[in-house]
């Protein structure tokens, strides 16, 4: 079985891992109630989406 010829340096290892990171969710302000919510999703506090009430609270 093949083995690495040289040890992978810290810099090369870290450069390879720069893409393995968590993404921050896109938060926007709800136009109806003003609370922060995830973009393109129903507001948890008032239950509206695109100006319409989707969930009865």
UniProtKB/Swiss-Prot annotation:
Alphabetized GO MF terms: structural constituent of ribosome
UniProt keyword Ribonucleoprotein, yes or no: yes
Record flagged with keyword Transferase: no
Name of this chain's protein: Large ribosomal subunit protein bL32
GO cellular component, one term: large ribosomal subunit
Record family assignment: Belongs to the bacterial ribosomal protein bL32 family.
UniProt keyword terms in alphabetical order: Ribonucleoprotein, Ribosomal protein
GO biological process: translation
Superkingdom assignment: Bacteria
């Amino acid at each position: 079985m093949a083995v690495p010829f040289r040890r992978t340096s810290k810099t090369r290892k870290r450069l390879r891992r720069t893409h393995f990171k968590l993404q921050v969710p896109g938060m926007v302000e709800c136009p109806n109630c003003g609370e922060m919510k995830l973009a393109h999703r129903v507001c948890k506090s008032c239950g509206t989406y695109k100006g319409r009430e989707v969930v009865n609270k």
